[in-house]
Amino acid sequence: MIKMMALLFKKPGLTDEEFKSYWKGKHGALAGKIIPGLRKYTQNHFIKLPGSKYEGDGFVELWFDDLEAVKKYLAWRQTAAAQPLLEDENKFLDRSKTVRYVVEEYFIIK
């Protein structure tokens, strides 16, 4: 499987708790239902420790069968069918700062 990861930044004006609550609740349910070809969906909410520097507010992991499925997902994001997801993202994300990575995992220790 191929994984797409994205570093997410909360929308200005939201508290950490508002961001996490919306992402985990409403958006998580929507993403799980609407994203085509999605095999697994994981949210990683940052635990911000005192004295540590953080870029962003969380990582999302989306698993797909192969690279073609990732490409189809990215193309889908440009269609009208993706509008409900994109509109929902605008409620809690600063999408202009999102950074995406497509990776292949290699387990070294399991």
Predicted regions located by residue number:
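Macromolecular interaction modules
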Residues: 1-110
